[in-house]
């Protein structure tokens, strides 16, 4: 059986070097229940992957009932559909795909295809933001960015020092500068900045989204493909010639490869 604690928060995680237990606190009665465990999972709701839209200089807007930022206006010729546009249920995503495809066809001068979105079960998505668990200092640190161990105290100190702009907070605290580039923690930091300054999240805004997200052609991932699939290599005009001549290719960084040597017959590296 799985016990569900409603109207409650994880107030503290106990353990040294590893998790040993959590303290769950009722939001209304403040009663504490301790549960032995070795792992704590957490969820921040659904956050659309808006990185490519942002890199294309597109703007974002905050949607209160989704508690997240979604694409607003596009500058370049890009269209967002489905979950990437804030349509988080299956029915919404399917309908979004249909409508945006019609728009795309129109923009490139093709006739609209008359079809209907597939039927799907009616779903509802709801979320209530909780930017910080309202507990006393005795419970220790409250982490916002799990990647870089950024806490609410770090954000408070940044604002106290006059770094209240979201770009300044990012650099003062290193929030959102881990290998996930803010994918897991940025919305928490923005929400906390807003809470501290009495602003809404749209007034706080976002930082510029960067890699690890980069465009990739559908041809790279569609259908049968030999060789690298997860991270396809880039090619120069002479790449095919090198491969045809039997070159042993070395990685050269940024998804490029260069010929290391051209073996003849059964030659190894030293012989070649």
Model-found features: residue ranges?
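Residues forming the flavin
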Residues: 1-233
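N- or domain-start disorder-to-order transition segments that initiate the globular core
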Residues: 231-272
């Amino acid at each position: 059986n799985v016990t569900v604690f409603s109207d409650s928060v994880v107030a503290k995680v106990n353990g040294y070097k590893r998790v040993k237990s959590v303290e769950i606190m009722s939001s209304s009665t403040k009663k504490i229940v301790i549960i032995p465990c070795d792992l704590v999972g957490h969820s921040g709701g659904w956050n659309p992957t808006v990185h490519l839209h942002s890199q294309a200089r597109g703007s974002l807007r905050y949607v209160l009932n989704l508690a997240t930022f979604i694409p607003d206006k596009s500058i370049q010729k890009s269209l967002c559909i489905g979950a990437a546009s804030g349509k988080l249920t299956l029915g919404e995503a399917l309908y979004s795909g249909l409508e945006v495809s019609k728009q795309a066809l129109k923009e490139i001068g093709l006739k609209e295809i008359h079809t209907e979105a597939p039927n799907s079960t009616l779903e509802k998505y709801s979320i209530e933001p909780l930017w910080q668990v309202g507990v006393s200092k005795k419970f220790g640190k409250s982490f916002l960015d799990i990647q870089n161990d950024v806490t609410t105290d770090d954000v408070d100190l940044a604002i106290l020092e006059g770094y209240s702009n979201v770009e300044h907070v990012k650099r003062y605290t290193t929030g959102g500068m881990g290998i996930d580039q803010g994918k897991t923690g940025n919305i928490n930091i923005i929400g906390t900045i807003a809470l501290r300054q009495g602003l809404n999240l749209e007034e706080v805004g976002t930082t510029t989204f960067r890699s690890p997200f980069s465009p990739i052609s559908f041809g790279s991932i569609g259908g049968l493909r030999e060789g690298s699939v997860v991270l396809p290599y880039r090619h120069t005009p002479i790449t095919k010639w090198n491969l045809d001549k039997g070159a042993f290719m070395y990685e050269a960084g940024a998804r490029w490869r260069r010929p290391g040597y051209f073996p003849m017959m059964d030659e190894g590296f030293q012989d070649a």
